[in-house]
UniProtKB/Swiss-Prot annotation:
The record marks 443 as: Transition state stabilizer. It is an enzyme of class 3 (hydrolase). This is Glycogen debranching enzyme. The gene is glgX. Its EC number is 3.2.1.196. NCBIfam families: glgX_debranch, PRK03705.1. GO terms for biological process: glycogen catabolic process. Belongs to the glycosyl hydrolase 13 family. Residues 460-479 are annotated as: Disordered. The lineage of its organism: Bacteria, Pseudomonadati, Pseudomonadota, Gammaproteobacteria, Enterobacterales. SMART domains: Aamy. Keywords: Carbohydrate metabolism, Glycogen metabolism, Glycosidase, Hydrolase. InterPro entries: GlgX_C, GlgX_Isoamylase_N_E_set, Glyco_hydro_13_cat_dom, Glyco_hydro_13_N, Glyco_hydro_b, Glycogen_debranch_bac, Glycogen_debranch_GlgX, Glycoside_hydrolase_SF.
Length: 657
C-alpha cells in the first residue's frame, strides 16, 4: 500500500502537482487526522496524515490523480461542555474542497450526536470531496472595474433568472451557462446594468427540516463547501467551474461585473441538533463562537456563528475570497449578515478579517458590500463598516416606501435618504457610493407585491405564516392581492413608477431586484427562501415590456446626470442639488418638517425631479427657464415645454432645461 509522504503545510486543501496530491487540514485540537480515499468501487483506504506543522496537518499521496474522491476522519476528545465534538466514525468534508460528489440528504448517520457521540460509521452515504486540476484559458479577460459612481447592481438568482426564459435554449435554462448566453447579456446591457449580483453559488445544503417538509433551500444561504460551486446550477457537475467562468468571461466582454453573495457568518451544520458535515468535526472550538456551556452563540439565527476573529478562520475566509477572485475573476462580494465579520466578539472596524482584507492586494481592489447587521445585541451596524465597504442602506428602503406608500415621512427625512443618507455614511472618508440604495431585495416583498399586499402570505413555507417580517411598509391600494379594476391597476403602476424613479435617480449606488423591472410577483410571500418553483422563477412570458422600458429609460437618464455619477457629496451652493418647494422657492424649516409632500429636486442645474406625493392634483411651478419633460415621462420626439406642471396625485415627473 502506498505510504503518505510528509508533504507541505500550504496551501490549504488538496492540490495536484502533476505527480501526486498534497493534502492539508487545519485543526488546533485534533489528536490524529486520517485521510480517507475511495476507489472506483467505493472501497475506502485510510492514511494517517504524517505532517503536523503548528495546527496544520498535511501529507502527500504519490501517484494520486484528479478525480480522486476523499474525506477526513478527525480524532480528538468528545467533550461537549468544552466545545469539542470529535467523532472519527463520521467522514468529513475538506473545508477547502473544490468539488463535492454526493448529496447532503437528511439522514441520521450524518449527525454526530448531541450529548453522546453517535459512533455509527457514515462513509457509505456521506458526500465525498473530489481532487480537481485547474486549467482554464481566460484569453484576454480583464475586470471591467466600473467606477462606483457609475455602478448599477442587479440582484438575481442563477436558476430563477433564466429557468423560464423562452429565448434561452431549454438545456441550459437555470444554469451558469445561461448567465453568459447572448440573450441574457443583451437584456442586461439594454437595461443598463453594470453589475450582476448573484445569490450564493458556493455549495449549500437544504436544512433537514425543509427536506422533511418536501421543500428545499432555494436562496442558498446555508453553505457547506465555500470553495465549491453549487452543482445543481451546472449542466454537468464535472464542468461547473468552467461553465461559471465562461459566463463571467462573456459578461466581462460586455462590460458587466459579477458580484457574489457570500455567506461567511455560519455553516449548514446549524445548531447542536444539526448535521455534521465538516467544521464541527474538524475543530468545533476554533471554527465557531462557543458559549461557556459548550453550545453555540447563535448570532445569525441559523444555529451557529463562525468565529472570524480566530487567526485560522480568518486565513480560511481570506483564502476563500481570494479563490473566487483569482480563479473565477469575480469583481466583488456582498457579505451576508456581515456584522459577524467584525465580531471580536464586539463589533470593531479593525477586526482581524477586516484588517486582512484591507491588507490584501487582491481583496482590497474589488467591490465589497456588507449587509451591515446580524441578530445579536449590537448587531445593527449600518454606517459603521470600514471605508473599503459599501453597505445595504435599509434606511433608504424604508424611507422610500413610507414616503410613497404610507405617506408618513417628512420631506426632510426623504431628502436625507435621497442624498445618499449622508447623516449615516459621510464619515471616515467614505463616498456617497457607500450607500447601496434598494427598495426591494431577495428578502422581502417584490416591488409589485409592495403595491398589491398589505400583509405577508407565507403559508407555503410551512411555518403557519410566522416567518418573514411584518414591517413591510406596503400598500395594496384598497384590495389585497393581484388584479383589480383599471383604476386600481393604474394607481399601483404609478406607485411602482415613483419608487423606481426614487431608487434610480437618487444619490448612492442603486440595486435593482431582478424581476422588479417587469412586474414579477411572489403572490405576497416575503420570505421565499424555500420556494424553488414558479413563485420565485421569473416568468418572462408575463413580463411587462412597458415597465421594463420605463426602468431602462430611468437608468440611462441617471447616467446623464453628473450629480449622480460623479460620486461626490453634495454641498451647499456647489451646483449639484437644490431643494425647492411647489413654488420653486427654497424650502423653509417648517416645510421640511411639516409641509405638504411636494418637492422639486434640481440636479446639476438642468435636471428637475418634480414630486407631488399628496392625494390631490397640484400645480407645481417650475424654476425659471424652458423645461421639457424627458423619457420615460415623455417621448423623445414630442417634448412638452412647460412652466407649470399639473402634478397628479402620488405622481412625479423629470424635466430638463
Amino acid at each position: 500500500m502506498t505510504q503518505l509522504a510528509i508533504g507541505k503545510p500550504t496551501p490549504l486543501g488538496a492540490h495536484y502537482d502533476g505527480q501526486g496530491v498534497n493534502f492539508t487540514l487545519f485543526s488546533a485540537h485534533a489528536e490524529r487526522v486520517e485521510l480517507c480515499v475511495f476507489d472506483a468501487n467505493g472501497q475506502e483506504h485510510r492514511y494517517d496524515l504524517p505532517g503536523h506543522s503548528g495546527d496544520i496537518w498535511h501529507g502527500y499521496l504519490p501517484d494520486a490523480r484528479p478525480g480522486l474522491r476523499y474525506g477526513y476522519r478527525v480524532h480528538g476528545p468528545w467533550q461537549p461542555a468544552e466545545g469539542h465534538r470529535f467523532n472519527p466514525a463520521k467522514l468529513l468534508i475538506d473545508p477547502c474542497a473544490r468539488q463535492i460528489d454526493g448529496e447532503f440528504k437528511d439522514n441520521p448517520l450524518l449527525h454526530a450526536g448531541h450529548n453522546e457521540p453517535d459512533y455509527r460509521d457514515n462513509a457509505a452515504i456521506a458526500p465525498k470531496c473530489v481532487v480537481v486540476v485547474d486549467h482554464y484559458d481566460w484569453e484576454d479577460d480583464a475586470p471591467p472595474r466600473t467606477p462606483w459612481g457609475s455602478t448599477i447592481i442587479y440582484e438575481a438568482h442563477v436558476k430563477g433568472l433564466t429557468y423560464l426564459h423562452p429565448e434561452i435554449p431549454v438545456e441550459i435554462r437555470g444554469t451558469y451557462k445561461a448567465l453568459g448566453h447572448p440573450v441574457m447579456i443583451n437584456y442586461l446591457k439594454q437595461l443598463g446594468i453594470t453589475a450582476l449580483e448573484l445569490l450564493p453559488v458556493a455549495q449549500f445544503a437544504s436544512e433537514p427540516r425543509l427536506q422533511r417538509m418536501g421543500l428545499s433551500n432555494y436562496w442558498g444561504y446555508n453553505p457547506v463547501a465555500m470553495f465549491a460551486l453549487h452543482p445543481a446550477y451546472a449542466c454537468s457537475p464535472e464542468t461547473a467551474l468552467d461553465e461559471f467562468r465562461d459566463a463571467i468571461k462573456a459578461l466581462h466582454k460586455a462590460g458587466i461585473e459579477v458580484i457574489l453573495d457570500i455567506v461567511l457568518n455560519h455553516s449548514a451544520e446549524l445548531d447542536l441538533d444539526g448535521p455534521l458535515f465538516s467544521l464541527r468535526g474538524i475543530d468545533n472550538r476554533s471554527y465557531y463562537w462557543i458559549r461557556e456551556d459548550g453550545d453555540y452563540h447563535n448570532w445569525t439565527g441559523c444555529g451557529n456563528t463562525l468565529n472570524l476573529s480566530h487567526p485560522a478562520v480568518v486565513d480560511y475566509a481570506s483564502a476563500c475570497l481570494r479563490y473566487w477572485v483569482e480563479t473565477c475573476h469575480v469583481d466583488g462580494f456582498r457579505f451576508d449578515l456581515a456584522a459577524v465579520m467584525g465580531r471580536t466578539p464586539e463589533f470593531r472596524q479593525d477586526a482581524p478579517l477586516f484588517t486582512a482584507i484591507q491588507n490584501c492586494p487582491v481583496l482590497s481592489q474589488v467591490k465589497l458590500i456588507a449587509e451591515p447587521w446580524d441578530i445579536a445585541p449590537g448587531g445593527y451596524q449600518v454606517g459603521n463598516f470600514p471605508p473599503l465597504f459599501a453597505e445595504w442602506n435599509d434606511h433608504f428602503r424604508d424611507a422610500a416606501r413610507r414616503f410613497w406608500l404610507h405617506y408618513d415621512l417628512p420631506l426632510g427625512a426623504f431628502a436625507g435618504r435621497f442624498a445618499a443618507s449622508s447623516d449615516v455614511f459621510k464619515r471616515n472618508d467614505r463616498l456617497p457610493s457607500a450607500a447601496i440604495n434598494l427598495v426591494t431585495a431577495h428578502d422581502g416583498f417584490t416591488l409589485r407585491d409592495c403595491v398589491c399586499f398589505n400583509h405577508k402570505h407565507n403559508e407555503a413555507n410551512g411555518e403557519e405564516n410566522r416567518d418573514g417580517t411584518n414591517n413591510n411598509y406596503s400598500n395594496n391600494h384598497g384590495k389585497e392581492g393581484l388584479g383589480g379594476t383599471l383604476d386600481l391597476v393604474e394607481r399601483r403602476r404609478d406607485s411602482i413608477h415613483a419608487l423606481l424613479t426614487t431608487l434610480l435617480l437618487s444619490q448612492g449606488t442603486p440595486m435593482l431586484l431582478a424581476g422588479d423591472e417587469h412586474g414579477h410577483s411572489q403572490h405576497g410571500n416575503n420570505n421565499a427562501y424555500c420556494q424553488d418553483n414558479q413563485l420565485t422563477w421569473l416568468d418572462w412570458s408575463q413580463a411587462s415590456s412597458g415597465l421594463t422600458a420605463f426602468t431602462a429609460a430611468l437608468i440611462h437618464l441617471r447616467k446623464r446626470i453628473p450629480a449622480l455619477v460623479e460620486n461626490r457629496w453634495w454641498e451647499e451652493g456647489d451646483g449639484n442639488v437644490r431643494w425647492l418647494n411647489r413654488y420653486a422657492q427654497p424650502l423653509s424649516t417648517d416645510e421640511w418638517q411639516n409641509g405638504p409632500k411636494q418637492l422639486q429636486i434640481l440636479l446639476s442645474d438642468r435636471f428637475l425631479i418634480a414630486i407631488n406625493a399628496t392625494l390631490e392634483v397640484t400645480e407645481i411651478v417650475l424654476p425659471a427657464g424652458e423645461w421639457h419633460a424627458i423619457p420615460p415621462f415623455a417621448g423623445e420626439d414630442n417634448p412638452v415645454i412647460t412652466a407649470v406642471w399639473q402634478g397628479p396625485a402620488h405622481g412625479l415627473c423629470v424635466f430638463q432645461r
